[in-house]
């Protein structure tokens, strides 16, 4: 900005010039003339300052220079607009502009893509650290047949075979997972290493699932009413005895009105509003739950009560009149008193969290974020978290993994942990000042940890001395080679389903395929009971029974036969943040990863401190309370529920053992066909051996990266493609979008191959517009208000429309070809499977729905392919930069507003 010439009335005016060092006419200074109100912008010589021609506020009025006075006139006060940083990414393309060639994030990290000679199929992906993944395809069908990556000189490879476009085998770690189908194409049986685990029998005429028979000899049989709704379910034991598990009664709208759990004896009745949202639950044991919604169909709050004691929780959302962002949560109230308040920056990132322990006691956590490569560019990666005189700071590698964490204590002392990862982002080493040791981890080509060595604390990258402690892991040499056979010489045996029977001094019994029923040994006698959705509702340990009262998978309250009761409270993301015990409120202190590090009372006094290793094993527990609060509190590492008696975490469908760093039992085989482009096919792994920033709340093989909410645009596509159409949880973190995930190689559209897959391209074009329209619908779906179909339809329709009016009209032909109808049927089958509560059936129906989604995506892609790359680039740039342009698509289609957060 320079003083340059005069206007027609002789006033000096300004123009843009190329910057030149030392040019006198380019030097200005800012002088505050009214605190908080404005500045005078004064030339270097001090005689002239910026003014507006004729004091005009009209568009195109000249900015001029007039004589400067010590007391500047009001018309010469300049209000400096607060300008936020930006997030940005960039893409380059192949020479024919058909495919992305590189994607670079805000930190300058780049992922490279290579394709076949026709630029159709992705053959190689090289992440930002130079690790390459190669892909091979069937020459006739383009089906992916192999995924491979080199890790420390060893090839990690997954292979696929197909029949009639269905996966029939997956090769991994020297054995295969096998899938068999009936003549109608329905999944009939699954096997591991040549041993059949379960078989599904359908009703006549390609009907619903009649029963599932497990390798242990048990079976689950379904019973339906005349409307083909699941009316009852039975467990058939190995000796042929039949036990009825539950009964369902439906209302005239097809929703469950009454559910009788015959195992616990509890009867639940449900109430819905006029648009089908669940607003109330009454249980025969006295538990009552009520929910209310706001005008945007978000859960505004809920109340629950048992034995005349209850609580009210209210979620506070952004209010435009208060200059808040309406799509974000601004706080939580408990019984009318605000307990959490959030502050955001211009990009929608949390910068402060205020915890109100009482009216007079508050603590504040402040967040800063990692800067981008250039000035003014930022990211969603958290750089530091500060609370009072205590702080944590973080750095990241090029793939977005946490590289260092420095913890500064209240006394000013600092302790540092440095993490190292291999080409699969598995944790291979940590230099841990907190534990005063260096720990190294070694894995086989199946991802199984084979050795854990501990040394004195060493910062040198090369370790030459011998470890002072080693843990060894030995695995099956045949069949299911991912099964841990010996841990430090202790033998582990398994049943036919892959569940452990003898485990580190304990004996275990299982039922319904994968549910842990009874544990004995080492002074422990523990029984567990589950509901129809497979969630644990009761445990009895050495004669003391604890009942869990759930809202979905969240434990609202637990009561024990010893007379104790604990209530738990959750934020708007579903993370537990407080508890009430013996009529006193307590609050959790957490780190960035969600680990509960301490418990504070209503005065802000820390009564309990926890310390874990990287895998969640409790190292130290300090308890200053007078009521044993440290042991009574069940939520610990990552906010998981910890069974103190068992020494394991319960993750809502499976148990996780922090001693071995592995899941106790395998996930269902059907999940393996969801991510065909991934090398992660080990059903026993916890978070793919990256426990630092990954989390597994529900015990499923699919997990999310937490740090900085670093789900980028492609992470959003992945989540939509795999979750939204199946009525699964749609991650709230999608509103906090960064670029780290897609640069770390998280470019896969789950179930449909790498970036170039049809559904990824189709949904990719409309992802932002689809989210804009589908977000409120999802909120309804999340709380039972609408079906997944409503959300799916919205995203698909808008996803098509983003390419323009011509493409939008193709929706009708898609309807005519029956693709939408078939998807609706698949969603119906999936929801019925969910009602049945069997994970195997659920996963099978989800896989079927994924395949139907792919077919629909391919059809959409045919009509939108010419413009998908440019549209997707707009999506990426606008999402990660936080801008909000209004785009008029080609062909006169709808105007699309990109979301801003």
What are the functions of these language-model segments?
Residues 536, 598-599, 617-622, 657-664, ...:
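Short, low-complexity export/processing leader segments characterized by acidic and small residues
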Residues 672-681:
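A short, polar/charged loop-to-alpha-helix boundary motif
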